Amino acid sequence: MNLSPREKDKLLISLAAMVARLRLARGVKLNHPEAVAIISDFIVEGARDGRSVAELMQAGAEVITRAQCMDGIPEMIHDIQVEATFPDGTKLVTVHEPIR
């Protein structure tokens, strides 16, 4: 299987998000990389499903809550930017204050 660096990055984000979701299901609070991975994966998959940039910017801030994160993590993550592939091309999606 020959994957481009971009495809490897997407696969790594997806795997990290899967692990984070399993931990969350066990009641473990998310750390910084886990929270970013879940939100990033949500955006990438939403783009693949055909959702709009504006919709993902709004919905991306509703993926996880403060209660699901370790103390101080929401304050550490001010913006998340993800390059996602939409049906009409690649676009940058920015979610401001993603954990509310």
Curated annotation (Swiss-Prot):
Xref: InterPro entries: Urease_gamma, Urease_gamma/gamma-beta_su, Urease_gamma_sf, Urease_subunit
Source superkingdom: Bacteria
Keyword Oxidoreductase listed: no
GO biological processes: urea catabolic process
One Pfam family recorded for the sequence: Urease_gamma
A GO CC annotation given for this chain: cytoplasm
Coiled coil region boundaries: none
Enzyme Commission no: 3.5.1.5
Keywords noted in UniProt: Cytoplasm, Hydrolase
Disulfide partners: none
Localization, UniProt: Cytoplasm
Enzyme class: hydrolase
Catalytic reaction annotation: urea + 2 H2O + H(+) = hydrogencarbonate + 2 NH4(+)
Recorded metabolic or biological pathway in which this protein acts: Nitrogen metabolism; urea degradation; CO(2) and NH(3) from urea (urease route): step 1/1
GO molecular function: nickel cation binding; urease activity
Subunit structure: Heterotrimer of UreA (gamma), UreB (beta) and UreC (alpha) subunits. Three heterotrimers associate to form the active enzyme.
Protein family (similarity comment): Belongs to the urease gamma subunit family.
Name used for this protein in its record: Urease subunit gamma
Organism whose genome encodes this protein: Rhodopseudomonas palustris (strain BisB18)
Lineage: Bacteria, Pseudomonadati, Pseudomonadota, Alphaproteobacteria, Hyphomicrobiales
Gene of this entry: ureA
